[in-house]
Amino acid sequence: MSKLSLFGLFGLVIRRDLLLAMRRRADVLTTLVFFVMVVSLFPLGVGPEMDMLRKMAPGVVWVAALLASMLSLGRMFSADYLDGTLEQMLLAPQSLSMLVLGKIVAHWMLSGLPLVLIAPVLGLQFDMPAQALWVLILVLLLGTPILSMIGAIGAALTLGLRGGGVLVSLLVLPLCIPVLIFGTGAVEAVNTGMTIVPHVALLGALLLLALVFTPWVTAQALRISME
C-alpha cells in the first residue's frame, strides 16, 4: 500500500468497492427499488389531484431519497470491518481521511447516483414541469452526496454495535434536515416562479463544508470504533 500514491489509493478504494458491490447487486437494487416504491405510492394514494401532486412532489422525492440512503449506510464499513480491511486502512501510511472519502464516493455512486437518474422519471407521475425536473436533478446531485457524507459519520460511530442500523438513523436524520429543506425549497421556488439561487447556493455551501470536514470526522470515528 505504501508504494501507491494518495490519489492512486483513493481510486483503488472506489474501484474495489464498486467491484464488490457488483457481486452483491441485490443490495444495490434494494435501495433503488425502495425509492421507486415509496415515491410511486403517493400518486396512487392521493389520486389524480394534479395540483396537490405537484405541491407534494419535491418533499416526497427528497424524503424517499433520504430514507433510501439510510438503507445502505450500515454496509459502508461493515464488510471491511469483518474481513480486516479496515484495520489495514487504519495502519496505511496514507491519509485515512482520503481513503474514507473514496468509500463515501463509491457509496454515493451506488446509492445516490441511481436515485438522481431515476428521479425525473418518477417526477412525471406528479405532473412536474420540465423546468422543475431539471432543478430536481440539480439539487439531488448537490444534496445526495451530503447525505452519504453525513451518513458515513453515523456508520462509523455505530460500527460493530448491535442495532446499529437504528442508531445510524437516529444520528443521521436530524443532521440531514437542512439538506431536505433547501432541496425541496429549490423545486418549490421553480413552481412558484421564484429564484432558486439561494437554495442552490446554500446546498453548494453545505456540500463544500461536508467535503472538507466529514472525511476527517469519519476517520476519527473509525479510530474510536476500532479501539
Describe these PLM feature segments.
Residues 45-56, 120-141, 159, 186-202, ...:
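Membrane-interfacial helix-loop-helix connectors in multipass membrane proteins
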Residues 70-92:
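Transmembrane helix boundary and interhelical loop/hinge segments in multi-pass membrane proteins
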